[in-house]
Amino acid sequence: MSRTTTVDGAPASDTDKQSISQPNQFIKRGTPQFMRVTLALFSAGLATFALLYCVQPILPVLSQEFGLTPANSSISLSISTAMLAIGLLFTGPLSDAIGRKPVMVTALLLASICTLLSTMMTSWHGILIMRALIGLSLSGVAAVGMTYLSEEIHPSFVAFSMGLYISGNSIGGMSGRLISGVFTDFFNWRIALAAIGCFALASALMFWKILPESRHFRPTSLRPKTLFINFRLHWRDRGLPLLFAEGFLLMGSFVTLFNYIGYRLMLSPWHVSQAVVGLLSLAYLTGTWSSPKAGTMTTRYGRGPVMLFSTGVMLFGLLMTLFSSLWLIFAGMLLFSAGFFAAHSVASSWIGPRAKRAKGQASSLYLFSYYLGSSIAGTLGGVFWHNYGWNGVGAFIALMLVIALLVGTRLHRRLHA
């Protein structure tokens, strides 16, 4: 007698057998399949953002070791997010053609290997090349994970599952910053990045093992004409271009604050250590709560109001960082992080329902704008820091958030007119 197994070769449970016999059934919350998807994508998000942002708290160290200005040092992060943004234009359509899981697994493995190789680079240009390859590789996870959830999870639970995925992103960003900051203080930055690379490699292997294969994936053509038609369709939508703008502004604000807050706090009167700068990433923990919470709140209040409220929380948190009290600054960072991850969770969960087809490409365009904001605003923030100090950086971030509120208001009115 043949033995029914799951996609990873493990014996299938009764629930798995039922799902296999009904291939069109969406995965619902509370089922073993939902737990596997949640754990797999949580670990993928964690590894992705640990790899991407591990250099952020050590920017002052890189400035000292390689004789760089803050703006030039920030390129080690900006080049990763820029290449990630460019890669999204290709990996989303690629996943539409060959499948979600193969693209994500390959991307995580390549990014982990490039991170380990970056610890062997002796020149700044060598480090930048590795960081560019890391960003390009991670583009295969960022948008495809969102698309996988929108395809495989029951529509009633997509916002909740997206919130859990984003919470994995927040923990990953926190872990990468925390490990690199503390390990750099006690050892050096090369050992710190090597530890993160090994951690991400283990996460990639676990992700490959437990993520179920796509059941609702239908391959589409990679012909340039088809890609252009879908691109035009997305940009003609009443809501998608505004969501793309939201991603640019939200991420640009978030990265700018965390890029330069460390420079500020290492100066007088605080003089905090590199380890403490890394510990500031604990502010990300609020994102692990606010992301799924925002997802559940959308069912009661709607996506527009929740996104606007979350953006307002970011603005209030930013204002608190303008004070000199270290406790007020950290409290402001907590609020800022909570608001960001909530707003991003809502915006990203809005993409799938709005896209009429080629959802992978739509998610890629959103995250292209998202990471483009990180690259452009993250580097421009260094100019404001150099010329105007933290007040200048705060004014720059506040301007982006006010524009985000205006865009969000227009989006809500347009889709509910």
From Swiss-Prot:
Keywords noted in UniProt: Cell inner membrane, Cell membrane, Membrane, Transmembrane, Transmembrane helix, Transport
Gene: ynfM
Database matches in CDD domains: MFS_NepI_like
GO CC, alphabetical: plasma membrane
Segments in the Cytoplasmic topological domain: 60-73, 123-125, 174-190, 263-264, 337-364, 409-417
Transmembrane segments: 39-59, 74-94, 102-122, 126-146, 153-173, 191-211, 242-262, 265-285, 316-336, 365-385, 388-408
Region (Disordered): 1-22
Species assigned in the record: Escherichia coli (strain K12)
Periplasmic topology ranges: 1-38, 95-101, 147-152, 212-241, 286-315, 386-387
PROSITE patterns cross-referenced by the UniProt entry: MFS, SUGAR_TRANSPORT_1
Pfam families documented for this protein: MFS_1
Family as reported in the entry's similarity comment: Belongs to the major facilitator superfamily.
Location in the cell: Cell inner membrane
Protein name: Inner membrane transport protein YnfM
A GO molecular function held by the record: transmembrane transporter activity
Domain of life of the native organism: Bacteria
Bilayer topology annotation: Multi-pass membrane protein
